Amino acid sequence: ANKRPVWIMAHMVNAVAQIDEFVNLGANSIETD
């Protein structure tokens, strides 16, 4: 079966400290503003 990737995006990450927070919540991609 062809499996497509699933992206769990952290939206509006505006500080470096937020990266760890969102990754710990399960995000596997980061979108910055």
Swiss-Prot record:
Key words of the record: Cytolysis, Dermonecrotic toxin, Disulfide bond, Hemolysis, Lipid degradation, Lipid metabolism, Lyase, Magnesium, Metal-binding, Secreted, Toxin
Main location: secreted
Catalysed reactions listed for this entry: an N-(acyl)-sphingosylphosphocholine = an N-(acyl)-sphingosyl-1,3-cyclic phosphate + choline; an N-(acyl)-sphingosylphosphoethanolamine = an N-(acyl)-sphingosyl-1,3-cyclic phosphate + ethanolamine; a 1-acyl-sn-glycero-3-phosphocholine = a 1-acyl-sn-glycero-2,3-cyclic phosphate + choline; a 1-acyl-sn-glycero-3-phosphoethanolamine = a 1-acyl-sn-glycero-2,3-cyclic phosphate + ethanolamine
Main function: Dermonecrotic toxins cleave the phosphodiester linkage between the phosphate and headgroup of certain phospholipids (sphingolipid and lysolipid substrates), forming an alcohol (often choline) and a cyclic phosphate. This toxin acts on sphingomyelin (SM) with high activity (9.5 U/mg). It may also act on ceramide phosphoethanolamine (CPE), lysophosphatidylcholine (LPC) and lysophosphatidylethanolamine (LPE), but not on lysophosphatidylserine (LPS), and lysophosphatidylglycerol (LPG). It acts by transphosphatidylation, releasing exclusively cyclic phosphate products as second products.
Enzyme class, UniProt record, top EC level: lyase
Residues the record marks as active site: H11
The family this protein is said to belong to: Belongs to the arthropod phospholipase D family. Class II subfamily.
Protein name, as recorded: Dermonecrotic toxin LbSicTox-alphaIB1b
Keyword Metal-binding included in the entry's annotation: yes
One of the record's GO cellular component terms: extracellular region
Location(s) in or outside the cell: Secreted
EC numbers on record: 4.6.1.-
PTM notes: Contains 2 disulfide bonds.
Cofactor section: Mg(2+)
GO biological process: killing of cells of another organism; lipid catabolic process
Membrane-spanning ranges: none
Classification lineage: Eukaryota, Metazoa, Ecdysozoa, Arthropoda, Chelicerata
